[in-house]
Regions:
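Blade/loop signatures of beta-propeller domains
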Residues: 27-76, 233-240, 388-392, 458-459, ...
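Repeat-blade elements of multi-bladed beta-propeller folds
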Residues: 48-52, 87-107, 135-163, 187-209, ...
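N-terminal cofactor/phosphate-binding cores enriched in small/glycine residues
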Residues: 57-179, 498-499
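Extracytoplasmic beta-rich repeat domains
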Residues: 80-93, 121-151, 176-191, 232-262, ...
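Short, conserved, GDST-rich strand-edge loop motifs in beta-rich repeat architectures
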Residues: 201-216, 274-294, 400, 431-462, ...
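Beta-propeller blade signature
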Residues: 214-226, 290-309, 358-363, 467-475, ...
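Loop/turn-rich, solvent-exposed surfaces of beta-rich toroidal or solenoidal domains
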Residues: 334, 429-431, 461-522
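Blade-level signature of beta-propeller repeat domains, shared across WD40, Kelch, NHL, RCC1
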Residues: 538-586
Length: 586
């Protein structure tokens, strides 16, 4: 691909970098050392270098100073209001005493991780789109996942479909490329993986009218930003089965297949794993795919990291008719069983809330387990074939079946965490149902092609609590009766963090950050903050002290089912902040 630099935007972007010249910040900048490739693959225990700390996406920290016994002694070390109002799904990173934050509108801030002092701030000049492009404006202002640290840089994917490389010490733009066409509707809501001098990320906006025919995972050279490969998630000419799965729908009339969450990477096999979202239009009645599975939507893809070649795929929800996308984090774990090590990929990939365990070397289905109330999947065969409840598939306009879970339920973008110490996967979930009704809609620039009307989100019959943390025992085979569930009225609105201190940490729409015992599910500590807990809690150690970082702010998850717990009001405004705790010195 020809490299296209936006020189005018680059000049403006540089002018928007604020560098704070205070003595302490200057010292932190001067001591900052490059993040090597080996560090990305094996990060120091005290640091958090990638979206989920390690690029297997486990979300686990080996730190244990904050533990079951000491968590009650947490106190606030410092707090920081994030740069802009709006939706907040930040994933903080920490290296060499610098805490990096990215919030909406692609603003990146570098803070002293010990004091909370600002070191630098980067505010990009973003491409302007018309106000009537409502869906694109909404999606492009919610940056999921993260930036990435590599060598002496911060790698950023932007809402206007650029890849930008910043200097980690000063936030100045080093290079950038327009990776996809923002005028068609493409945007990045997914942070990158950077490994082996390659930036791997995935584009979003693929259910917007102008993006028909292509949704992509792509790799760029870290040093030159030239494209190395791209993989189309809804049009694979090398796979006749994939083409046939869309029925008579030609590639130019296909939408969807967005990889909404950052993938994982296995260095042993040089494989990157990505989850793929729903098709569009959402109902086959409108999209014209008849009873086809519409590959590779709602699938896990295993790609060669050097070439982008497809190694295998597994489809978790074929023939989606309800916007129950399955793109969320794919987690790589190794488990011992029968004297052998088995390489697994585990995930609760989507909104129907079903847990899957796959052999990550072959894609073989091993087992699955339901977590929340769902009525869409009727059964899964021993070979992994997924069967649907045909009664819920709309066959005429005006039909409005009740679907559980809902478009806002089950597993959403909030990531789970896996502890290798307990061999459990901890998942934040939401119980919810809604009706779905297919519509005939005109597709306009900058707006979605879903063509569906969703009813109010309600709790499933017999369920009185929206929020759920489910601890799932992970093995080669299913373990009946192991693990635990912790239910609560308010929905879960943050990702989870697991630590060697025996804790699982996350929070909810009711503004509570909580620490659960990772073996029993007992809540050991909680504190109410200024706004719903959001983003991705994380932890690091600096100068002998372990710190816990808790982001807060409003996200799409915060209000999606708030009517189910009216006694817990959600504050107006956003309250986008980070609260940083450490153990009391008293």
């Amino acid at each position: 691909m020809t490299k296209t630099y936006l020189k005018a935007a680059l000049a403006l972007a540089v002018s928007m970098t604020t560098l704070v010249s205070v003595a302490h910040a200057q010292g932190v900048r001067e001591s900052y050392a490059p993040v090597t490739n080996d560090m990305v693959l094996n990060p120091p225990a005290e640091e958090w270098l990638s979206w989920r700390r390690t690029i297997d996406n486990q979300g686990f920290s080996p730190l244990d100073q904050i533990n079951r016994d000491t968590v009650k002694n947490l106190e606030l070390a410092w707090a920081w209001p994030m740069a802009d109002v709006g939706l907040q799904e930040t994933a903080p990173l920490m290296h060499d005493g610098v805490l990096f934050l990215q919030t909406n509108n692609n603003i990146v801030q570098a803070l002293d991780a010990k004091t909370g002092d600002l070191i630098w701030e980067f505010r990009p000049a973003l491409h302007k789109v018309p106000a009537e492009w409502g869906y694109q404006l909404y999606q492009s202002r919610r940056q999921k996942n993260s930036i990435a640290l590599y060598e002496d840089t911060v790698v950023l994917t932007t809402v206007d479909a650029r890849i930008v490389v910043l200097g980690a010490k000063d936030g100045k733009v080093l290079r950038e490329v327009q990776a996809f066409d923002v005028e068609k509707g493409y945007s990045y809501t997914v942070g990158p993986i950077v490994v082996n001098n390659t930036i791997i990320s995935a584009i979003s906006g693929c259910s917007i009218a102008g993006t028909a025919g292509g949704c992509y995972i792509a790799a760029h050279d870290f040093n030159t930003l030239e494209e190395k490969w791209r993989f189309n998630t809804i049009n694979d000419p090398n796979n006749p089965d994939q083409q046939a799965s869309w029925g008579e729908v030609p590639p130019e009339n296909r939408w969807g297949g967005t990889p909404w969450a950052t993938g994982s990477y296995d260095p042993k096999t040089n494989t990157t794993f990505w989850g793929i979202g729903m098709p569009a239009p959402y109902a086959e009645l409108v999209r014209g795919s008849e009873t086809g599975d519409v590959l590779y939507t709602n699938s896990t893809l295993a790609l060669d990291a050097d070439t982008g070649e497809l190694k295998w795929y597994y489809q978790h929800l074929p023939r989606d008719n309800w916007d129950l996308d399955s793109p969320f984090e794919r987690v790589l774990v190794d488990v011992e069983e029968g004297g052998e090590t088995k390489n697994l990929l585990i995930s609760v990939p989507g909104k129907n809330g079903i847990f899957f365990a796959l052999d990550r070397n072959t894609g073989e289905y091993l087992w699955s387990q339901e977590t929340v109330v769902q009525n869409v999947v009727s059964r899964i065969d021993e070979d992994g074939t997924v069967h649907l409840n045909e009664e819920l598939i709309m066959t005429a306009l005006g039909e409005a079946p009740m679907i559980c879970t809902s478009v806002s339920g089950g597993k959403l973008w909030q990531a789970g965490a896996y502890s290798p110490l307990t061999q459990q996967f901890y998942v934040p979930l939401t119980e919810a149902c809604n009706t779905t009704e297919a519509t005939q809609s005109e597709f306009t620039a900058g707006n979605a092609t879903g063509a569906m009307k969703f009813g109010p989100r309600v709790l499933p019959e017999g369920i009185t609590e929206a929020g759920l943390v489910d601890a799932i025992k992970v093995g080669v085979t299913k373990s009946e009766g192991e693990g635990w569930k912790s239910r609560q009225r308010a929905s879960m609105t943050s990702s989870l963090l697991a630590t060697a201190g025996g804790l699982v940490i996350g929070g909810d729409a009711g503004r509570y950050v909580k620490a659960w015992d990772d073996t029993t599910g007992e809540v050991l500590w909680q504190q109410r903050l200024n706004a719903p807990i959001g983003g991705y809690p994380m932890t690091y150690e600096l100068d002998g002290d372990q710190y816990l970082v808790v982001p807060t702010g409003f996200s799409a998850a915060a209000g999606s089912i708030a009517s189910a717990f009216p006694e817990i009001p959600i504050p107006s405004g956003t309250g986008n902040s980070v609260f940083v705790y450490r153990l009391s010195k008293q």
